């Protein structure tokens, strides 16, 4: 069966969904889908899985605070029988996670790559081969894990996904669960637009351990952000990518909409975890090298984040800050 063959499911029948990499993003969307009647299995770390198995997933938003009964597992084999796999691992773990789940995927399953960066769908497709349907998804949501089995939502919650045999059905079913989904043939442009925003703020927030509002108020930071964005846009143009909307305006407006938010890279650095910097600013650097476009600021930010202390004092670390996936 090739990737164009959809798994036979009724347009109204509940979906079987596996979340590969059950962090804040996957848990939030998974909880909404489970509340809507879909069969959702979270695949994550032992402490988180144990909490969900014992108590369900605690979903905390501005409007509600509920326990959502869900299945959970630490094993990649739990993707078996899933109609849709929400692939939410860090970009640093893409190939490894894809290899782990490959033997267990059901024929006709759709893998949605819901990650930072612009090439995860290509990397997953290279591992899984042409027989598996893989569609990129752009995620717009602010969420954070407040502890094992506890996800907090701070704002937004939309997806833009690439076309596939199942994408329209997924959009309808997700929409009925309260998740706004747009199926777009220009997901690459949307992924790049989000990449530019991430390149502008993620590294700076991580290096300074500051949320976006105070960060951009510091003298000179706004100019640095503008220069980083200019480099990214130059690489995108050279790569033949058309970005939707006014990306520089979106970058400038972000701190006002979420002034208290730390970047996901800031949280990774604070906790001593591997960051995705090589798939954010580092990706722009690599494409710039290949296309002959200089990217000195993006390179500097990439190197500095790599050199950042592996762990900061607990008093300096952000306390469960919302993460802009």
Feature roles, as predicted:
Residues 114-194, 200:
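Rossmann-fold dinucleotide-binding core
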Residues 29, 64-150:
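Rossmann-like NAD(P)(H) cofactor-binding subdomain of soluble oxidoreductases
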Residues 2, 175, 226-325:
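NAD(P)-dependent Rossmann-like dehydrogenase/reductase catalytic/cofactor-binding core
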Residues 14-16, 83, 157:
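Nucleotide donor/acceptor-binding cores
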Residues 2-64:
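NAD(P)+-binding Rossmann beta1-loop-alpha1 motif at the extreme N-terminus of oxidoreductases
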Residues 72, 105, 149-159, 209-215, ...:
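Helix-loop-beta segment of a Rossmann-like dinucleotide-binding subdomain
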Residues 188-216, 220-234, 259-260:
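Active-site-proximal catalytic alpha-helix in oxidoreductases
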Residues 38, 179, 241:
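Short phosphate-binding/catalytic loops that engage adenosine nucleotides
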